Amino acid sequence: MTAKPVLNRAHFFTSVAQFRDLPPSRAEVAFAGRSNAGKSSAINLLTRKNRLAFTSKTPGRTQLINFFELTADTYLVDLPGYGYAKVPPEVKAKWEGLLSRYLQEREALAGMVLIMDARHPLTPLDRQMLEWFAPTGKPVHILLSKADKLSNSEKALTLRKVKQELADRETVSVQLFSSLSRVGAEEAAVRIEGWLAPEAAVHAPG
């Protein structure tokens, strides 16, 4: 019998608002993204659980770091959405401090999945996330989300431009993704599961 993919085993574990409250370290992959970029929808698609991550019509609603257990040794981590203008400055500052410290100091973090809206990639805050994470030397996989809203020529152009702009970052990879059409879901899942269990990684098709 084929083992159930690791991502499909996800279930809620805990939420934390302070760095000191983080659970004991395990191998983990963090999902980050600008508010309303489609992060929660991406998590729900990749785990095949429609309501695992909270989706809201009000960007910036998720203010906690949410941990989802995959196995006894691994977590999927949903980081607070960032960059929504209506969030009070003091709340925004708290989020930014928590995010930067988590990304830079969480030793068990295997990699970061950074979700960007394919129509507006590499915003200043997206770049800030990359800068915070760069000193760790750990991999970043960018999902250019909502790709279904672009024409085929726009998809190709956007992917090429983002790859060119990040060409000097050896630890960064990029792909197109759509939670609605499921474009790129298998590619992303293979990448993430490879980070969590390299010895058990399934080779990407083709």
From Swiss-Prot:
Coiled coil: none annotated. GO terms for molecular function: GTP binding; metal ion binding. Keywords: Cell cycle, Cell division, GTP-binding, Magnesium, Metal-binding, Nucleotide-binding, Septation. Its cofactor is Mg(2+). Pfam families: MMR_HSR1. Transmembrane segments: none annotated. The keyword Flavoprotein does not apply. GO terms for biological process: division septum assembly. Mg(2+) binds at residues 40, 62. The keyword Cell wall biogenesis/degradation does not apply. SUPFAM superfamilies: P-loop containing nucleoside triphosphate hydrolases. Belongs to the TRAFAC class TrmE-Era-EngA-EngB-Septin-like GTPase superfamily. EngB GTPase family. PANTHER family: ENGB-TYPE G DOMAIN-CONTAINING PROTEIN, MSS1/TRME-RELATED GTP-BINDING PROTEIN. Necessary for normal cell division and for the maintenance of normal septation. This is Probable GTP-binding protein EngB. It comes from Thiobacillus denitrificans (strain ATCC 25259 / T1).
